C-alpha cells in the first residue's frame, strides 16, 4: 500500500460524502488535471482528508473534529509511508504543520518532518473560486514533480577506484603468514 505521494485535504464535500471517496467533485477533477500535468495519476498517489466525515452544512472543520480524526490520519500515514505530502488548504495546513505560517505565505515551500517533505498548496477548490490561484497551484505541483525526480532518481554509480600498480603486482612466492600486529 505504500505510495510516494500522499495528498491531504480538509474534509469531504457533498460529492465525496455521497460516493465515499475523496476529491471526486469539481475540486477532484482539477486535482486529477494537476496530477496528470506532472505525470501522476490517482492510482499512483494516496488521497485523504483531515476529517473523515463531512461537517454539517459544509462548514469549515472545527478544531475538535480535526483532533478526533487525527489518529486515523496518523495510521494512514504509517501505512502509506510517503516521501512527499501535499497539504491542500488552510485547514489541513493548520493541523499538519501548525505554526509555519499562512497558506498564502508558505505554499510551494517544503518542510521536512521525519525525513518526509511536506508541501502546503492551495486547495483546488480555492483555485476554482479564485482563478488567480491556479498558476500558483500549477507551479507548486511542478515543484513536487522536481522533488520526486530528485528523490526517486537512481543513485549515481560510484566511480571505480583507481588501483595502484603496486596493488596489482603479483604476491610474493613465499607462503609465509604475515602478522597483523
State the predicted function of each range.
Residues 1-181:
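A polyanion-binding, active-site-adjacent surface
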Amino acid at each position: 500500500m505504500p505510495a510516494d505521494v500522499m495528498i491531504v485535504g480538509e474534509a469531504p464535500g457533498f460529492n465525496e460524502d455521497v460516493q465515499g471517496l475523496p476529491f471526486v467533485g469539481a475540486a477532484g477533477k482539477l486535482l486529477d488535471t494537476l496530477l496528470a500535468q506532472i505525470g501522476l495519476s490517482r492510482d499512483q498517489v494516496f488521497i485523504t482528508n483531515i476529517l473523515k466525515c463531512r461537517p454539517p452544512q459544509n462548514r469549515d472543520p472545527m478544531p475538535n473534529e480535526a483532533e478526533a480524526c487525527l489518529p486515523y490520519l496518523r495510521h494512514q500515514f504509517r501505512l502509506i509511508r510517503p516521501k512527499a505530502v501535499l497539504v491542500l488548504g488552510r485547514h489541513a495546513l493548520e493541523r499538519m504543520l501548525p505554526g509555519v505560517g499562512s497558506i498564502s505565505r508558505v505554499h510551494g515551500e517544503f518542510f521536512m518532518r521525519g525525513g518526509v517533505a511536506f508541501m502546503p498548496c492551495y486547495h483546488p477548490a480555492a483555485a476554482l473560486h479564485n482563478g488567480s490561484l491556479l498558476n500558483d497551484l500549477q507551479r507548486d505541483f511542478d515543484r513536487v514533480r522536481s522533488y520526486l525526480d530528485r528523490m526517486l532518481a537512481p543513485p549515481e554509480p560510484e566511480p571505480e577506484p583507481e588501483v595502484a600498480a603496486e596493488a596489482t603486482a603479483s604476491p610474493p612466492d613465499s607462503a609465509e603468514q604475515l602478522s597483523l600486529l
